Amino acid sequence: MKALLDLFKQVTQKEEFDSIKIGLASPEKIRSWSYGEVKKPETINYRTFKPERDGLFCAKIFGPVKDYECLCGKYKRLKHRGVICEKCGVEVTLSRIRRERMGHIELASPVAHIWFLKSLPSRLGLVLDMTLRDIERVLYFEAYVVTDPGMTPLNRGQLLTEDDYLNKTEEFGDDFSAVMGAEGIRTLLSNMDIPLEIESLRLEIQTTGSETKIKKAAKRLKVLEAFNKSGMKPEWMILTVLPVLPPELRPLVPLDGGRFATSDLNDLYRRVINRNNRLKRLLELRAPEIIIRNEKRMLQESVDSLLDNGRRGKAMTGANKRPLKSLADMIKGKGGRFRQNLLGKRVDYSGRSVIVVGPQLKLHQCGLPKKMALELFKPFIFNKLETMGVASTIKAAKREVENESPIVWDILEEVIREHPVMLNRAPTLHRLGIQAFEPILVEGKAIQLHPLVCAAFNADFDGDQMAVHVPLSLEAQMECRTLMLSTNNVLSPANGDPIIVPSQDIVLGLYYMTRKKIGAQGEGMVFSDISEVVRAYENKVVELNAGIIVRIKERKKSRSHGEEPVEAITRYETTVGRALISEILPAGLPFSIINKVLKKKEISKLINASFRLCGLRETVIFADKLMYSGFSYATRGGISICLDDLVTPSQKNDIIHAAEQEVHEIANQYISGLVTQGERYNKVVDIWGRAGDQVAKAMMDQLSVEPVTDRETGQVRADKNGQVVTQESFNSIYMMADSGARGSAAQIRQLSGMRGLMAKPDGSIIETPITANFREGLNILQYFISTHGARKGLADTALKTANSGYLTRRLVDVTQDLVITEDDCDTDGGVIMKALVEGGDVIESLRERILGRVAATDIVNPETGAVIYAAGMLLDEDAVDEIETCGIDEVKVRTPLTCETRYGLCAKCYGRDLGRGMLVNVGEAVGVIAAQSIGEPGTQLTMRTFHIGGAASRTVVANQVESKSNGVIRYSHHIRYVKNAQNELIVISRSGEVYIQDENGRERERHKIPYGATLLVQDGEVIKAGQILASWEPHKRPIIAEYAGKVRFENVEEGVTVVRQIDEITGLATLVVIDPKRRNVAQSKGLRPLVKFLDENDNEINIPGSDQPVSITFHVGSIITVRDGQQVNIGEVLARIPQETSKTRDITGGLPRVAELFEARVPKDVGFLAEATGTVAFGKDTKGKQRLVITDLDGVAHEYLIPKDKHVTAHDGQVVNKGEVIVDGPIDPHDILRLQGVEALARYISNEVQDVYRLQGVRINDKHIEVIVRQMLRRVQIMNAGDSSFIPGEQVERAEVLTENEKLIAENKMPATYEYVLLGITKASLSTDSFISAASFQETTRVLTEASIMGKKDDLRGLKENVIVGRLIPAGTGLSFHNIRKKQRLSESAAYLDTDLTENEVTE
């Protein structure tokens, strides 16, 4: 019996470990793993199916094929356990050890490990300081390498060809040794003195001045340091013993018909063994050198193929010409070990089926088909049957269940009660894609799903399937109930808004209920309470939409939950439908909140208010009741669509006719040469775009109102003046769109307006629009034109899904180890939040931006000076309301960017957990949530890049800014301007802004003012809404004179640098600067047309404070508007640059833009930022580039070489600020980090990403983007190593530097200084400290090669590593589990040390 118990014990042993280390295996290590040498290539005997002795499946080496039975059958059964059979040499034990025991092959000649040879950069090359090409020549027997030069003039590591070698042998005899093949490389490696090499390299780095040498030396130094530190020997990169994988992991399976299916590894091993044995035989026979060489090369190639097939040369193929799957292929890629078996496992106790709607369910329930439940809950039923005594054994219980006897169904009901199950819909894009429900048994075979959770699952009922999973253990059930139950997931973790919002018919029903109809039956009746209204409605005395007056009893509640709700009775003018809804309103919500037409947005606000005021439980019940009402009244309303609902506007024909006239006119202008082809096309597209909008507007105007008809007479009602009385329309289509249930104005426009302009396959717009709509029907040409767009939509969707999924995967990978690990890191850092104002519109108010954040400094009331909220307070709805009423316009809040927690984040810097509505808990995996929140809406973004000239160019170019509110004008400190002769203020700064403050001094709007604009208001002037603040010429950019004087041209030569153009219409001649490339005279290529100013004595005017003359360069395409020798005043225009000449850039939009930002790619045609604050001057041009010099305040010059076709926004003598744009173009985020710091970078990425999502109407909290930026900035570059062990220029984790610096400061040594490095998400994922996580992401081979040389230790900090090694993840409940485990380990080790000490004392 004891033996039996021992047997069970064997299975359940569990190893406790805290980290995993990877390294190179020494030959001794490999032999110690092995249970014997594999000498023969045979696998199994094809007659007896028994493994051959000493072969690849040998039972003597790897263990018995059957449990407790040796191969020859002499020993069977448990009693012989552990005996080794003397006849066949097999140990009698479990056959399971054939999965664990390894063998080995003694190689007759050393072989290089291909990973360390070919995985770039080649590690062997770095260690030996040889090129990969040279090492390969030695390894593959094309050259000799000198291993010991002796007294000869040869160098160690020098390569000799065959002829060289023979000559040198004649010359020096055997004073030197040179070898071919891996032996030579191995000798070189084993003779290396690593500490000595490290010394000389460090010396070289300090003494040499060459950049490339330093870089190269640093790379070598890193590898050698790693070998030195890890205690591994470089010669282990050359294999002398090859380990053999346990046979069960490369199985050979007999198929029917006498054939065998085998793993490719067996083939690869067989080749290695065959070649190895042949080589041994040849060596014994003393075969000629050339034959042996060939055999050694073949051995090297076969080992290469086994380790990584296809890495070098042609891949080895099997019988069917397909490349064999090597060891490296087994672990990498989507089908490899990491992603297929470790990160994505299939689970037991699960099922899947089609979903159907279950409108009668409560929010926390789902319908589970009986058959499915029976199968899923089998073990529970067996157990119950046994305890009840219905079945004596499991077998009997099984029989009962299979016969489906009545008692089984009763037991199933009992087992299922209060046992939640998890439902999952693929693709699971965010955490709400798996939720727990209580199952209700249903007939049929489909799972029933509650309609309100569809939004979270993104499910519909057109044939979607869902999977069911059963949590087995009590802990799992508990977590399901407390964390995953659908009623606990009311808010979306992406933005904190409710995600359980009614949609479609529910919205339509509620909208219809709350609409008011003039002249409905029972209008104007007065009721004493709701129940009276219900009676009247049910007896058909009043209609649902009639306006009535009713007394309503309310229980009002304030947000601070201390006080009891107060009862009050108020009279309301309302409608019957709204009165009916007030019955289901939870106590504490005022009636006024539903006394309006309920559209989708209003319903969302309603549920949000309910959650904040009445708590979770009430809200869930309320949402359910809303749903039942919505369905019920949508049915009673009987809203449907018929053709007459599609009202085509009467003005349509006139509008189209007018547009056709305009187009005709422009065509005539084009023929007579007044407009260019491009202008004509743009204008035509503009005209039709406008016409389409006009038709749509006319249609909506007609659709949205209807005349009121009298119920009795059926006549249209008129007022005193004989005007027709109108009301909001009850047109079905209008109601659907207006309520937000389905459809939009754009779709209705196509149904009953005109379809409008269509795009060609290349994205350009076809200038003849479709004037018909779907109601009228399309003709053949119109139909053909529209097919392209429709198909492109489908193709786009498929691409989008894949791209979006890949983006999510990269985001998850970079943030997966970010968990809230402590309560407060006590930092005083944070970011200052203001309202986001663009133009005159507040895009995001201050309240939205700071809601759910923690204040970083005390928030003070500006009027009283009293502290309203202390630092460290979580700002909830009440707080942000008060901050807004106090007129505070900026607040410093904590942010994940400045959090000082080493591994992880602190709760205070993160703020509110958006999915739960309170301060985030320790253990929350905020990284993954951030990644999901950004990745999940990815499928809604567009895929394409817009070309200007497509739909984008329809927006009219702005030529002025006007205020939208009353207030006081304030100039920003960047703005610089001059006064011209007419006393107008002309702006001469590039990044100037004006903003408007209201009477409380709060910023209301902010406008960018371009260079050359005329300011029409003064700083501090009081203005009215609608006043024009500044105006400018939209299509031309001026160059403004900042000095007065006489103009002198230089290098302005007609026919050389400029040409005279006659304007066709006006007949005036102007000078236009031509492109240097088009100049015909060779020596004139370098000439730059410029202008200087002379004072009255004809001396050149200098830049104030310097001896440099003012010179202003005219750029290519400039139209010069002054004459040589003309007297000009300050603020006058010297030249104009037509805007059309600036190249139209493609605007990257949608998903590619988001990916580009997070990958931190340098955009093409990148703009330049000023490296320092200083004065601009132009230097000498080079070929094709112009040289721009900024001299800073200390007189240090910073040079730029800028391509000639780029537009430099700065000009000679202009003062620019550090980080200001000096060359137009998209900005490189790395520049922003370098010149403006972390905060500016985060702001830039945040705003840019948000712009993309905002365009699609997706709300994501800034917090999530900040979390990802934090991960992109987690590595730093060492600038000065101080007394640390870092190498200058090395990139390391920030946490590592901080820890090291703390130690150094404690010892009074020099800490290392560093700069932040911005890494793209892919790069950041690969450069993480955890090699397991990086290897499972991408580039598995490279990651593992590097890690093994470094002897890296993975501390299993992140989630991914722990999933891979099969432990609980260190997040949520797992975090506390790991912490408790660590504490226990510490106390155990402490106790262990104590006992040691006492024993020692005793012995003393």
Curated annotation (Swiss-Prot):
Domain of life according to the entry: Bacteria
InterPro entries named in the record: DNA-dir_RpoC_beta_prime, DNA-dir_RpoC_beta_prime_bact, RNA_pol_asu, RNA_pol_N, RNA_pol_Rpb1_1, RNA_pol_Rpb1_3, RNA_pol_Rpb1_3_sf, RNA_pol_Rpb1_4
Class of the enzyme per the UniProt entry, highest EC level: transferase
Coiled coil stretches, renumbered: none
GO cellular component, one term: DNA-directed RNA polymerase complex
Co-factor binding comment: Binds 1 Mg(2+) ion per subunit.
Annotated binding of Zn(2+) 2, by residue: 825, 899, 906, 909
Catalytic activity: RNA(n) + a ribonucleoside 5'-triphosphate = RNA(n+1) + diphosphate
GO biological process, one term: DNA-templated transcription
UniProt keyword list: DNA-directed RNA polymerase, Magnesium, Metal-binding, Nucleotidyltransferase, Transcription, Transferase, Zinc
Annotated Zn(2+) 1 binding sites: 70, 72, 85, 88
Keyword Metal-binding on entry: yes
EC number of this enzyme: 2.7.7.6
UniProt entry tagged with the keyword Transcription: yes
GO molecular function: DNA binding; DNA-directed RNA polymerase activity; magnesium ion binding; zinc ion binding
Pfam families tied to this protein: RNA_pol_Rpb1_1, RNA_pol_Rpb1_2, RNA_pol_Rpb1_3, RNA_pol_Rpb1_4, RNA_pol_Rpb1_5
Binding site for Mg(2+): 460, 462, 464
Protein family (similarity comment): Belongs to the RNA polymerase beta' chain family.
Subunit note: The RNAP catalytic core consists of 2 alpha, 1 beta, 1 beta' and 1 omega subunit. When a sigma factor is associated with the core the holoenzyme is formed, which can initiate transcription.
Biological function: DNA-dependent RNA polymerase catalyzes the transcription of DNA into RNA using the four ribonucleoside triphosphates as substrates.
Descriptive protein name: DNA-directed RNA polymerase subunit beta'
Organism: Nitrosomonas europaea (strain ATCC 19718 / CIP 103999 / KCTC 2705 / NBRC 14298)
Lineage: Bacteria, Pseudomonadati, Pseudomonadota, Betaproteobacteria, Nitrosomonadales
